[in-house]
């Protein structure tokens, strides 16, 4: 019988990993109605990079790549995309998993290797992606602070007509 500490312990890191992932790029979802999913994520402040009836790419204001990828299909979580900083890592992964390096979606650019985790979820590893153009960041709201002098002395009006922008995944 294992103790709670043993059951909840994080597995040790591999001493010789196949590659070093440098970041989370995107989550991948499928939804029967891509347009409805796009509107849902826009309501939370994401921005559309590209969208049609079969595929939508959305991002936050600071994201350099699309951070939410929605494909048409039964409602499901499909997997995620991760990035590596070295093209050799893609080829090493492809060889180790008996797959190929392929061109990534044109809106993202670069190359990718698509793997499956033990539960069958897609894990896409990308390299050489093209950064998206920066989006204007929201201006910060000036607030009166107890020790702040001089006082701002003006009314702050918040814009509730649209959701706040999502900064980053």
How should these model regions be labeled?
Residues 1-17, 23-33, 72-168, ...:
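Vicinal oxygen chelate
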Residues 1-3, 20, 28-31, 50-56, ...:
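N-terminal start-of-chain detector that recognizes signal peptides
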Residues 19-22, 26-65:
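Core segments of cupin and vicinal oxygen chelate
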Residues 39, 68, 90-92, 135:
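Short acidic, gly/pro-rich beta-turn/loop elements at beta-sheet edges
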Residues 46-78, 122-129:
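Conserved short beta-strand elements that form part of the metal-binding/catalytic scaffold
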């Amino acid at each position: 019988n294992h103790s709670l500490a043993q059951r909840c312990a994080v597995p040790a890191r591999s001493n010789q990993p196949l590659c070093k992932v440098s970041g989370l790029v995107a989550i991948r979802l499928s939804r029967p109605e891509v347009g409805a999913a796009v509107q849902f994520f826009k309501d939370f402040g994401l921005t559309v990079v590209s969208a049609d009836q079969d595929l939508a790419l959305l991002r936050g204001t600071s994201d350099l790549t699309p951070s939410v990828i929605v494909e048409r299909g039964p409602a499901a979580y499909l997997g995620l995309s991760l990035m590596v900083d070295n093209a050799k890592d893609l080829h090493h992964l492809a060889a180790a998993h008996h797959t190929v390096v392929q061109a990534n979606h044109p809106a993202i650019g670069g190359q990718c290797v698509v793997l499956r985790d033990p539960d069958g979820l897609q894990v896409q590893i990308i390299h050489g992606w093209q950064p998206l153009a920066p989006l204007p960041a929201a201006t910060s709201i000036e607030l009166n602070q107890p020790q702040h002098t001089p006082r701002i002395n003006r009314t702050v009006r918040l814009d509730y007509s649209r959701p706040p922008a999502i900064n980053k995944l």
